[in-house]
């Protein structure tokens, strides 16, 4: 997502290949790749299964970590983490301190939700030494090789 995309949380809807924030005021996001594609897929899956759609907290980040730091800070400070049943972390800049603060906040909020690490977030989960706190990693073939090598610091 574009670096100018603000930290935005809440419900989203899918329409014509674009994600729209339920509250409006945010430019629609194309679901062609990345986190918007993951969220679009989750929305379609929930619709098909007839279950409540997820909420999502998104931030623009093109690799310098600014948007990811905002997201980490928001999650670590959020009193609304209690009652969350599952969280999927996807394409966040690998920030060990941010990761660890979020993990501690989740432990304090209890009970621990199901935690899924996908894409780049798997790297920080492994590097932190807390990979066992996660219930599911979803690697592709290259990521799987990295995760299996206990001595590899980065893919």
Predicted features along the sequence, with ranges:
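Small-residue (G/A/S/T)-rich helix-start motifs and N-terminal tracts that mark the onset
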Residues: 1-90, 95-100
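Conserved beta-alpha-beta core of the PfkB/ribokinase-like small-molecule kinase fold
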Residues: 90-155
């Amino acid at each position: 997502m574009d670096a100018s995309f603000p930290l935005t949380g809440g419900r989203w809807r899918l329409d014509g290949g674009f994600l729209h924030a339920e509250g409006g005021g945010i430019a629609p996001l194309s679901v062609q790749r990345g986190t918007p594609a993951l969220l679009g897929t989750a929305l379609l899956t929930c619709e098909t299964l007839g279950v409540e759609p997820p909420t999502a907290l998104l931030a623009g980040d093109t690799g310098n970590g600014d948007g990811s730091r905002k997201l980490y800070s928001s999650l670590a400070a959020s009193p609304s983490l209690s009652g969350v049943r599952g969280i999927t972390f996807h394409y966040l800049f690998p920030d060990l301190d941010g990761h660890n603060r979020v993990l501690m906040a989740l432990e304090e909020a209890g009970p621990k939700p199901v935690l899924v690490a996908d894409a780049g977030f798997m790297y920080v989960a492994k590097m932190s030494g807390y990979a066992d706190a996660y219930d599911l990693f979803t690697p592709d073939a290259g990521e799987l090789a990295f995760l299996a090598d206990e001595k590899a610091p980065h893919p």
